[in-house]
């Protein structure tokens, strides 16, 4: 099948989670015999035409010039290019800046949308932006032929709010068979006797709620490791609040 992946800055991954997924999933699809195209920003560090068999389609991305607004133009450029290519499937990763162009999506391909998280609830966004993101979510939920939820909570939300079925597909991870257990000594924990939270240090990820629960459970003394980029305002807040 001829498959397109939209909604990321491109592959290989230099940016974040959706790019990481696009990199590995696109190559996997090629290995399964599909013809795969991934849209990249024109200024992506990788400027080759193919990546491990994946066709790379560079499109103009003025984010460097206009900030977030440039993402809407980039997504528009990707969609307009996709209209010319007779794809069988279009996989959109996220909906923030592409759902407003739903009426331009080519009609023939099956349109699959990974709905990401509840972006409109993120506290870092102003009220007008949150309202826009809520509308963007509604447009994506209504226009997608198939929806993908990366958590059971999102799947339940989509059904309750939009009466739309979705397929739950959790994020994957690399498995390794020979971990270096000596690393645990650096953190003063033992194999099989610790809990771990790995997340972005942002308020909406509720790390403080997790740690408050741990602090209140006086009977369970299992150590907990919190992993993430903690050199942030929220990270400083957590370290001060739970320093004991």
Q: Could you say what each language-model-derived stretch is?
A:
Residues 4, 185-217, 225:
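Conserved donor-binding/catalytic core segment of Leloir-type glycosyltransferases
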Residues 8-14, 27-66, 153-155, 159-161, ...:
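N-terminal strand-loop element at the rim of the active site
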Residues 44, 173, 198, 221-237:
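Glycosyltransferase donor-sugar binding loop
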Residues 70-83, 87-116:
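An aromatic- and histidine-rich active-site surface loop
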Residues 80-83, 129-147, 156:
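Membrane-proximal helix-turn-helix segments that form the acceptor-binding/catalytic region
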Residues 124, 172-191, 236:
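Acidic anion/phosphate-binding donor-loop and adjacent secondary structure
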Residues 154-174, 187-190:
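Helix-loop-beta element that forms the nucleotide-linked donor phosphate-binding surface
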Residues 236-244:
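Nucleotide-activated donor-binding/catalytic signature segment of Leloir-type glycosyltransferases, i.e.
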